[in-house]
Amino acid sequence: MGNYYLCQVKKAKNPYYIESISANIYTIEELCYYLKENIYLIDKTLINEKLCDWIRDELGLKKLYKRLYEQLEREESIGNFILPIFKEIGYLSHQEFKNLQEKIVQIEIQPDDIRRKLKADYLLEYKMYINAISEYSKILQERNPGNMGIQFYASVLNNMASAYAQLFLFEEAADCLWQSYGIVKSKETYKRYLNCLVICLPPARCDEKFKELKVPDELRQKIQARVKEISISAKESARAGELSEIPMEEIVESLKKEYHKSTCS
């Protein structure tokens, strides 16, 4: 099936806001596209009465509303809930829906923490850093090492550190990495932690911290040189040259969009 779909029903006057991606949708086609492309984000924050009411009131699809509401009352699986939405406009071929349903089943049979991590990792990949951090935090608040094993939570902390670092919150990133290292003594995690210290601490305090940790001089020098190299590289990046060709108004607007997307605001 192609990537373009003819708009078959009316456009909503009032959009439906999808919190996980901070976006408004106006048509059932847009809803279908979201469901198909973001299966890791489909949960009760989307599959609820509010969505059903929007489909009835804004799109005028009363029969579909009734069908979906019945699915909610029976507490059907996510796969069973979204099937009528796709069928309403024939958005997917039979094989496409079968493949999608298989993916959803594989997600649904996973423990809650793994499903949450899949969602958080997806948000991290698509630069929704604040929402990713929120999901990682929920996992850590309710953690039960007996269920998932300590390595799972070390991985959660590592990924959470990545989200913080993307927001330039290097102290928070360092804290996550130190917690992760306390769970699993990974050399890579330790090096990432030291990198964050070089970035977020004043030089004198960083030297003190390295002495406390008994970091070998050779490793300290290597890390400091690497961070300096990255800093210089960033300043001299090709992007700086590209930006010089773009009007300042466009640069500011682009940076605004990137910021709002990453903070989900």
What are these regions (language model features)?
Residues 1-112:
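Long, contiguous interaction/recruitment modules in multidomain scaffold/adaptor proteins
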Residues 99-265:
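Extended amphipathic alpha-helical coiled-coil/heptad-repeat regions
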